[in-house]
Amino acid sequence: EVPAGTTVLEAARIAKVNIPTLCYLKDINATANCRLCVVDCGGRALQAACVLPVTPNMVVKTNTPAVREARKLNLELILSNHEKKCLSCVRSQNCELQKLCLDLGVESGDRFAGAQNEYEPDMSSASIVRNNNKCILCRRCVGACANVQKVGVIGPVRRGFKTAIESPWGMKLAEMACINCGQCITACPVGALTETDGTKAVWKALGDSAKHVVVQPAP
């Protein structure tokens, strides 16, 4: 038994039944965008478990051939507009999208090959790098910014194929009211939002014999 209002996804997690997700973050983001959590409830169409409330005597099938195929199809559609440079991505081997591809047997993202959006990475911020070429439009960063930090400076813009997660009027990160908290980075399941990498600057400083370098570890 679960409390009234519990979703099928949360009930499944309580019961230790695995249902894959990409866009869901408990109490932060439940928008059913990725459609990877679809389940069979006996109706004409598969339902998104993350927004589907549990009802009495409900029968839910989470791992039928039709469910697995639908999840795989939706994952391939997500990959069709995703930059596939996994070897050079800082999230390689720590990427939720990559892990789901392995779990669902998706070997390439070429099934729906076609036009792709191309964006210039935003490196204007002192602490955050935004690369929308890797964005999967899950909106987890939007939920974290609005619901955790209560700042709400990013959101979906435009429609259809041109939809992107950006700041208002196309402003760069350094130009808007971003407080550089990093909650969006923590929420991002892929490499679309990452921390600014200061590795090269550190190596350069260490190699400068005229510079006295002090290291301070963080707790």
Regions found by a protein language model. Give the residues of each.
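Short, contiguous acidic and Ser/Thr-rich linear segments
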Residues: 1-6
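A basic, amphipathic helix-loop patch mediating RNA/tRNA/ribosome contacts
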Residues: 8-42
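Fe-S ferredoxin-like electron-transfer domains
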Residues: 35-180, 186, 193-216
